[in-house]
Regions:
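A structural preference for short, pocket-lining loop segments at secondary-structure junctions
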Residues: 91-103
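Ligand-binding beta-strand-loop-alpha-helix segment within the catalytic cores
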Residues: 65-92, 106-193
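Generic secondary-structure signature for well-ordered alpha-helical cores
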Residues: 43-54, 141-150, 181-185, 218, ...
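Generic hydrophobic/aromatic pocket-lining and core-packing "Φ" positions
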Residues: 38, 45, 141, 176, ...
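Generic structural signal for well-ordered, non-membrane alpha-helical segments
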Residues: 8, 30, 34, 38-41, ...
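N-terminal glycine-/serine-/threonine-rich phosphate-binding loop
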Residues: 1-94
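Short loop/turn segments at strand-loop or loop-helix junctions that form parts
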Residues: 17-22, 98-99, 156-157, 190-191
Length: 263
């Protein structure tokens, strides 16, 4: 996918939103979602979509699962018929999220990022990592659907994407493209994938966002994080300085990408 040109779309992508893993999970607690932040972000995304889609103020949940937040199946069919989000096929939104406290533990102890699927521990860790990150993806999709956003989870591994160590290697964007053109909001996540050089690796949400921005050519790319903006070093560093202005050049972009705190 890295070598391909812009993917032809019948409808343009308006925005790619990257949800930082540190913004939607508690990174210091194993597999713990920050429910408050996730709810706030889901609400803000719905409100942003409403500005361009004339969505009604009343939110109609698309989460019909039996759980503590929504124990009853819908009975008002007209509520869905009158919801522009379910009629609008021009939403043009793609969401990518980091793993946060999901997947990192499993990937770290098994060294999935170093490859070597011939090793039993690496293969076991690959499976465990995917179970963890897809669990988070499911919960984020659930939260978005609760706000009436027609979101669908897309896993890089299931889409056939591969890595080239830290970058996307081969990958077919047709599934994502078809989802967008059908009026859905794809929700993609960092994932354990097969690697062209070392057998397997971790494909981060940041690498996915960068590649999708290149191939889909959106109007905007928005990063939602747990910090105030872009710093000259990891924000956890006491000497970190918030950058008020950024001069755009290719050299600086790549340098900034590798300095960026992994979310």
């Amino acid at each position: 996918m890295e070598g391909r040109t812009t993917v032809p779309l019948r409808k343009p992508i308006r925005c790619i939103v990257k949800l930082g893993g540190a913004a939607v999970t508690f990174k210091n607690e194993l597999e713990k979602i920050n429910d408050h932040n996730l709810h706030v972000l889901s609400t803000q995304l719905r409100e942003s979509i409403a500005e361009t889609s004339r969505s009604p103020e009343r939110t109609v949940s698309l989460n019909w699962s039996r759980n503590s937040a929504n124990s009853n199946l819908p009975c008002d069919v007209n509520a869905f018929e009158s919801n522009p989000l379910l009629h609008d096929t021009t939403l043009g939104l793609v969401i990518v999220h980091g793993a946060g406290s999901f997947g990192h533990f499993q990937a770290s102890i098994s060294a999935v990022h170093k490859g070597g699927l011939h090793k039993p521990l690496v293969k076991a860790g690959f499976v465990a990592t995917r179970i963890s990150v897809t669990t988070l993806n499911h919960e984020i999709v659930r939260a978005l659907a609760q706000e009436g956003i027609p979101s669908v989870g897309l896993s890089p591994f299931s889409c056939g994407w591969t890595s080239n160590k830290i970058n996307i290697g081969e990958g077919d964007l047709s599934i994502l493209r078809n989802a967008v053109e059908s009026g859905f909001v794809p929700v993609v996540h960092g994932d354990a994938v097969l690697d062209e050089l070392q057998g397997c690796s971790i494909l981060s949400g940041d690498a996915i966002t960068r590649s999708l921005a290149h191939h889909l050519n959106p109007q905007f790319v928005v990063f939602l994080t747990d910090v105030l903006g872009v710093y000259d070093r990891p924000p956890s560093d006491p000497n970190a300085r918030l950058l008020r202005e950024i001069g755009i050049c290719f050299h600086f972009i790549f340098k900034l990408f590798f300095l960026w705190v992994q979310l």
